């Protein structure tokens, strides 16, 4: 336990009630890790932390899961944390599971497309999973395994981030 307090730089002579929200999160994590669990279930564990401490916590998580008998299940709105350490991602929106996939498979499944609204109306929609309109442009997800030959100088296709995939699927019209 003391090892985790020191590693997470938790002040040991400050009453818990006087600690910052970030230090309270870290002390809860230290208590959980000190019990040598096989499974950590965490809710928004990195949300109250500054970027430097968040990075330290993520490194600690990576060390924890190097032992293949151990796992972490955590919810997060910080998708960059998921990109750094997740093996599997489950996206739940408004109580519905939208997907549950291996992170690498998820990132290889789609292309993110961006074009003008007028151009989108003329595109073949085969392979387009979802889209949303944003001012004068349309942002869409293209299932890369199906593809549809969407290549045009007026259409930008790029590798999406997890956040972009989630945004289009949550905000967009599903085809």
Language-model region placement:
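ABC transporter nucleotide-binding domain
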Residues: 58-142
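ABC transporter nucleotide-binding domains
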Residues: 1-73, 79-80, 84-87, 93
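C-terminal coupling/interaction segments
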Residues: 129-175
């Amino acid at each position: 336990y003391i090892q985790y307090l020191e590693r997470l730089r938790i002040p040991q002579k400050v009453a818990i009630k006087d600690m910052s929200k970030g230090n309270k999160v870290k002390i809860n994590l230290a208590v959980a890790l000190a019990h040598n669990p096989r499974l950590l279930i965490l809710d928004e564990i990195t949300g109250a932390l500054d970027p430097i401490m968040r990075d330290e916590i993520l490194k600690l998580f990576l060390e924890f899961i190097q032992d293949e008998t151990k796992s972490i299940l955590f919810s997060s709105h910080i998708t960059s944390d998921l990109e750094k350490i997740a093996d599997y991602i489950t996206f739940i929106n408004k109580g519905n599971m939208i997907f549950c996939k291996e992170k690498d498979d998820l990132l290889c499944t789609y292309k993110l497309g961006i074009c003008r609204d007028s151009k989108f109306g003329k595109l073949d929609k085969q392979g387009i999973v979802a889209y949303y309109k944003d001012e004068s442009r349309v942002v869409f997800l293209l299932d890369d395994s199906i593809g549809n030959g969407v290549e045009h100088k007026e259409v930008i296709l790029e590798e999406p981030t997890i956040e972009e995939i989630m945004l289009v699927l949550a905000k967009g019209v599903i085809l």
